[in-house]
Amino acid sequence: LLKPTKIYVSVVRELSKSISVKQICHITGGGIVENLPRVIPNGKCAHIDFSGGYPFHKDLFDLISSKANLTIKEMTEVFNCGVGLIVIIHPADKANLEYKLKKVRQPFVRLGKVVNDKTKKLEIQFG
């Protein structure tokens, strides 16, 4: 059930060889809600799509939220929900990023996009 923290140094080094990484966010205590806004520049907002549920380890996080009586929104405020690292890139680098992550056998999912918005730094869409 529990695994040691994933160390992403080798993955990030591989990515940075050919991809312009804009921001990197390690999701730790405080979950996505507290950590991601810290790396979003002023005037920008990260739009995250959780409408399909948890992107990784869905059964595990469904069990935790059920037993703890927490909504998925509350879960994203406390846990990483299976998302250990968020890498923000330019959209033009998407295909290259996917290729590199597959090459190093790093599971990934596209969570959303960064848009212009001066009113907030994070918006999460829930199902």
What do these predicted ranges mean?
Residues 1-127:
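Glycine-/charge-enriched secondary-structure boundary and capping motifs
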